[in-house]
Structure formats: C-alpha cells, structure tokens
C-alpha cells in the first residue's frame, strides 16, 4: 500500500524519518502493511469499526441536540513507541504524580507551598476543584490521586511535553483495551511477529489498586464502580471496567449510609461497601456536603469517608490539580517537594491573571491557544490562528472579565502518525494519554495509553467530542531506539 511512499512533510512523524525511511521501531510494521493492497487495508479498517460498534464502544456528546451515542473511530495504523523511550516517559510520569500527590496533601493540610510563596493562596482557593470540606482529610496510604490520565504531546523537534493533568475522573482506558482487542482480531499475524507489550492486565491492576485502599483487616473487601448513570458520556467505560473487574456497577440510589457504613442495596438486604471507584465529579458525591440538589451521590458519604470507613478513588478534592492554572506550577512543585528537576516539561504557559502575561496574550491572540482553566473535551478553547476576528474579540473580552480563568500557550507543531483517510494514507496530529495507578508504595504506568488523533486535516484538536479518533498504541518489548 501507500505507506512506503508516505510523505511525513515538515512534521515530526512517529513512524517515519522521511519518505521511504521508517523509524527502526516502525520498520517491521511498514514492511508488513506494505504487502497489503489499499482495498484490503480499507476492508480491515471497516471491519474494525463494525467490531467496535458491535462491542458497544461509544461515547455521548453533551451538547449533541439529538443525544446520539457515537462510535469513537479507531484508525488501524498504530502508533509505535520504542521500549527505551517508554521507560523514559514512565520515569517522568511517576515523578509528576508524586509531586502532585504531595501538593494535594499539602494544600489540604499545612499549605507550606503557599506559605513559602511558591503558589499563591488565591489561585488555590479560586480553583473550582478546591474543596474546603476536604481540608484535614487524610486519605488511605496518603494517596489522593489513585488513577491519573496525563496528556502528552510531542513537538516538531520530537520533544515530549505534558499538555494536561487529569486527576479527577480520567476516562478513555476502555478505548485502549477495546482498540487492542479489535486490532488483535483484525491483524493476528502482526501480533505474532512483532514484540508488542500487552495491555489487557489493566482491569486486574486497577482492582489491585482499589483493594489496597480498603480499611485494614477485611478478608474480602467489597469494591463498586459508582456511575452517574446511563446518560453520562463515559457510561460504556464505567460498565466495561466494572464487568472486567468483576465488581458491581452502582448508581447513587443503590447506596445508602446505614449503621455508620456505606451500604449497597441488594436483593438479600444491605451489604457493606469498602471501596468506591467513583466516576462522578466531586460536586455530586454527597448532597449534604457539596451540591444539595445532587441526585447522583449518597447523603452522608463524606462523613463515612472522613471516619476511614470507606475509601474513595480518586479522593474528593483531587480536581484542584486539573485546573490549568495550577498546571503551570507543577514544575515548581517537583522542585519544591521532590528536590528534583522535571523530567517532562510543561508547555510554556502564560497566566492571564498576571498583568504582563495578560497584556502579551491580548496582543498576540492570533498566535496562541487560549484555554479556560476548568473546561475539558476541547471546550472553552480558542485556537488563535484559525479563529475569526470576532471570536478573538469575544475571547479577549472574557479574558479581561475573568483573567484568573484563562491561560494561553504557543501553538505546538504536534507530531503526526500516518492515518487512513478514505483510500489514502495521510499524516494526522496526535496526542497520548498514558494511565497511571498510584498505590502509595508503588506507581504503575500502563504500557502505551490512548493515542487520540485529529481526523480533520490540519486540526490539532484530538478530543472525541470534537471529531477525533484513536489509534492502538504499541510499546515494543526489547527495542532500544
């Protein structure tokens, strides 16, 4: 097929140095796929989409007027990462999670990082994810962020950057597992000849992480996955993970606080619950503490949690670290808490609450990406170079009105991966979301992660809600380049 003649252009390409020159880790794949005709590859691609549909791999877009569930399309040309490069990323991700966990322990405790002038108090307290009811809480094993999805990008020079931290309720791991399942059934020969690290252990790794949180001296801790319900955009994933771990999927109405413990309603009566993997935002967890109008949570849950009678993952309050203004301080957190230099760099970031930064951003909106501090999914964002003058003017007014709520970053020349578009192979921009499990005494980074791809030509927005797709991510075993 056309992979041999694929032109990576003036971008860092994950599979090719130049036309006809694959990177060492990609050479076996390119040779193998080169034997397939465009028609056969297209058939395989369509088969993969049908398989995802039959598996029910869907997501729901909140602003979709029709409320239709959509398939998250997978492109069948994978992204490949050499083992040595992956080990380097692993080290940087573990370092970052350690520092963020120290930060959460600190700001809900002595707030030394504030007292020492590293992070301003008003920045912490004005973050929508900072929850005063969590001050003084000591989560099991001192771990706040048990499950994290960290978004990484690579620039035109091949350097990795952290784009975003997702600690509150990171999603997407189900796509990683189901994409691999579909790829293995579509191309079984490739998985027999190319040494690809497996990914199917994630549910057991997650269950082990959750069981480690249970109160001590319990012979058989009960774990549940708490979902907002079937209308949530990631409901497929909630159901999938519960089924894969062999635990109950519950909604708030299935749980009740009774006799000082969290209990689950069953056909045989109430059953004590010891660990909750919660997939709803902090505000909805407990109407007695947070939003009083929440019908999704459990009244009294936070009091049971404070008493150490149930564990919650992730811990309430972790959302403060998702704030994109807080993100800008993570390199300083690494210096402050770990006495180390960051192994993974942040994207250079302008903080609009600073007058000098704000003036620069307002003068250079056409060159920058502007992001709202607490929105996700590609929403609340301005792509300056492609925005209209009217859109830039509207964003400028928003920045002036609430500068604390906005950051800006240069437009990175994101790396690309060959992607099947119609009957042609074209380069498309990608990011990478690895998944990290923090058990306190051990941090586990799942091999690969979710590669999201911007399917629209020239687009840098990879989010599923904005028309993006995904790719299987191969971390090779024994590769050094």
From Swiss-Prot:
Annotated InterPro entries: ATP-dep_Glu-Cys_Ligase-2, CP_ATPgrasp_2, UCP005522
One Pfam family linked to the record: CP_ATPgrasp_2
Entries under SUPFAM superfamilies matching the protein: Glutathione synthetase ATP-binding domain-like
Domain of life assignment: Bacteria
The family this protein is said to belong to: To M.tuberculosis RV2411c.
Name the record gives this protein: Uncharacterized protein sll0335
